[in-house]
Every structure is written in structure tokens, then in C-alpha cells.
């Protein structure tokens, strides 16, 4: 989760988020190099006294500054396209979770199991435990197994919502009358926080998401206890 004065991305908890961070660093490096080069050229042009009175055209330099940006754009576009296709792949999920956005809470259904569904509301500040996180903790967490492929189906009951967990690199719009899906793989245990990322009304900022990643054995015990 984001911490106080944190300006960077959250620590990744899935292979997809790791790839997103790598792409961010790759694109940022290229942008910094371009900025430094342009700044250096502008500085040198402003503070030198050299003048070429016979310069009419420069076909070579025009070719260079046309072809070079095209090559740079390819270096950014190709990794981006690869990542877009990776984000859309569904790889034989072990668990399917359905999330339904409401004004202003989430409801969840474990589609592979009978009778496991619940609503998840934000805990009000006056009811929060001393170690709770304001505007982020919920009364019912989503329990998911680590090291397992998870598919999530997202829809909405009223207006457009967006189910987002930054540490997992997941952001899926919930649209009324439509099922959107994506997949993710949690590679470590822990609590991962997210929020609705589509303005959906007065209490838009009060519908957080909390995922608790647990070992598979613990997940099976939790499923068994809820089924019984």
C-alpha cells in the first residue's frame, strides 16, 4: 500500500506489476535521456556566438531528426504492446472471483464454490481499530490463495465503477450489464489495498478493496469453514 510521502510505485506483488514497473523505468530512462540532450542543445545554442551565414538547408540533419524519433518510439511501443497482450491473457485460473460494484460498496462471489458470497463495506472511522487504516479497511476482506492464477469478473449494479489494486497491477472497469475479466497471480502473502478508481457518486472515495493473500492450505480451510 502507499505510505506517507511515497512518491514511487507500490511494491509489486504479482508478475504483471513487476512488468509494469520495468516498462515504467524503461520509458522513464528514455525520457530523461531526451530531456538532457534537448536541454544541453538549447543551452549551447543560447550561449555561443557561432553563426553560419551560408546555411540554406540541411537534408542530413532533417533525415536524422525524423528517423531517430521514429526509432525511439519503436523502442517504447514494442514493450508496451507486449505488456498489453500479457495483461489480457487468461491462463487456466485456479479460482474465479466475481466482484459487483454498488453505490458505495463491493459485493463478492466465489463462482467455483457454493454459498460463498458477501458484501464488503468500508469500516467507518469511529468504529476503526487502533491499528486499522482510515478509509482503507473493510469489514469483509477478499481471501485469495497465493501462487495461484486468479481470474476476476467485474461488473456493476448501478453506475460505472473500477476495481483497482495497484500492488497487483489490476484495474478493471465495472460496467452495468457487462462482465469484464482479467487475471492476476499473487506471489507473496499479505494485505493488499485498493479503491474504486472511477468517480461513481458522492461516496466514491469510501469503497475500498482489501485482498488478503494466504497459503493455499489456509484458503482451503477458509472455504471449508464458510461452506459448512
Curated annotation (Swiss-Prot):
What's a single GO BP term from this record? Answer: ATP synthesis coupled electron transport
Membrane-related topology note: Multi-pass membrane protein
Residues bound to Cu cation A1? 161, 196, 200, 207
Q: Which UniProt keywords apply?
A: Copper, Electron transport, Magnesium, Membrane, Metal-binding, Mitochondrion, Mitochondrion inner membrane, Respiratory chain, Translocase, Transmembrane, Transmembrane helix, Transport
Q: Which residues bind Cu cation A2?
A: 196, 198, 200, 204
Give the binding site residues for Mg(2+): 198
A GO term from the CC aspect? mitochondrial inner membrane
The record's free-text note on cofactor binding: Binds a dinuclear copper A center per subunit.
Q: Which GO terms describe its molecular function?
A: copper ion binding; cytochrome-c oxidase activity
InterPro entries registered for this protein in UniProt: CcO_II, CcO_II-like_C, CcO_II_C, Copper_CuA, Cupredoxin, Cyt_c_oxidase_su2, Cyt_c_oxidase_su2_TM_dom, Cyt_c_oxidase_su2_TM_sf
Main localization, broad class: mitochondrion
Swiss-Prot/TrEMBL cofactor(s): Cu cation
Where is this chain's protein located in or outside the cell? Mitochondrion inner membrane
Instruction: Enumerate the transmembrane spans.
Output: 27-48, 63-82
NCBIfam families documented for this protein: CoxB
Which family is this protein grouped under? Belongs to the cytochrome c oxidase subunit 2 family.
User: What quaternary structure, including any partners, is listed in this protein's UniProt entry?
Assistant: Component of the cytochrome c oxidase (complex IV, CIV), a multisubunit enzyme composed of a catalytic core of 3 subunits and several supernumerary subunits. The complex exists as a monomer or a dimer and forms supercomplexes (SCs) in the inner mitochondrial membrane with ubiquinol-cytochrome c oxidoreductase (cytochrome b-c1 complex, complex III, CIII).
What biological function has been recorded for the protein in this entry?
Answer: Component of the cytochrome c oxidase, the last enzyme in the mitochondrial electron transport chain which drives oxidative phosphorylation. The respiratory chain contains 3 multisubunit complexes succinate dehydrogenase (complex II, CII), ubiquinol-cytochrome c oxidoreductase (cytochrome b-c1 complex, complex III, CIII) and cytochrome c oxidase (complex IV, CIV), that cooperate to transfer electrons derived from NADH and succinate to molecular oxygen, creating an electrochemical gradient over the inner membrane that drives transmembrane transport and the ATP synthase.
The name this protein carries in UniProt is Cytochrome c oxidase subunit 2
Q: Which organism is it from?
A: Drosophila yakuba (Fruit fly)
Q: What is the lineage of its organism?
A: Eukaryota, Metazoa, Ecdysozoa, Arthropoda, Hexapoda
State the encoding gene: mt:CoII
Amino acid at each position: 500500500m502507499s505510505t506517507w510521502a511515497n512518491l514511487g510505485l507500490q511494491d509489486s506483488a504479482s508478475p504483471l506489476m513487476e512488468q509494469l514497473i520495468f516498462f515504467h523505468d524503461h520509458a522513464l530512462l528514455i525520457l530523461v535521456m531526451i530531456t538532457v540532450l534537448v536541454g544541453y542543445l538549447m543551452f549551447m545554442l543560447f550561449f555561443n556566438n557561432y553563426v553560419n551565414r551560408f546555411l540554406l538547408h540541411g537534408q542530413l540533419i532533417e533525415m536524422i531528426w525524423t528517423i531517430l524519433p521514429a526509432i525511439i518510439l519503436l523502442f517504447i511501443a514494442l514493450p508496451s504492446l507486449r505488456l498489453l497482450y500479457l495483461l489480457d491473457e487468461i491462463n487456466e485460473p485456479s479460482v474465479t472471483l466475481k466482484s459487483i460494484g454498488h453505490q458505495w460498496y463491493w459485493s463478492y462471489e466465489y463462482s467455483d464454490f457454493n454459498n460463498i458470497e458477501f458484501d464488503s463495506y468500508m469500516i467507518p472511522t469511529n468504529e476503526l481499530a487502533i491499528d486499522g487504516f482510515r478509509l482503507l479497511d473493510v469489514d469483509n476482506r477478499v481471501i485469495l490463495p497465493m501462487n495461484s492464477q486468479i481470474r476476476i469478473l467485474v461488473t456493476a449494479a448501478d453506475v460505472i465503477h473500477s476495481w483497482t489494486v495497484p500492488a497487483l497491477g489490476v484495474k478493471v472497469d465495472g460496467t452495468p450489464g457487462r462482465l469484464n475479466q482479467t487475471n492476476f497471480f499473487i506471489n507473496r502473502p499479505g494485505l493488499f489495498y485498493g479503491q474504486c478508481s472511477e468517480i461513481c457518486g458522492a461516496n466514491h472515495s469510501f469503497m475500498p478493496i482489501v485482498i488478503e493473500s494466504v497459503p493455499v492450505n489456509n484458503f482451503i480451510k477458509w472455504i471449508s469453514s464458510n461452506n459448512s
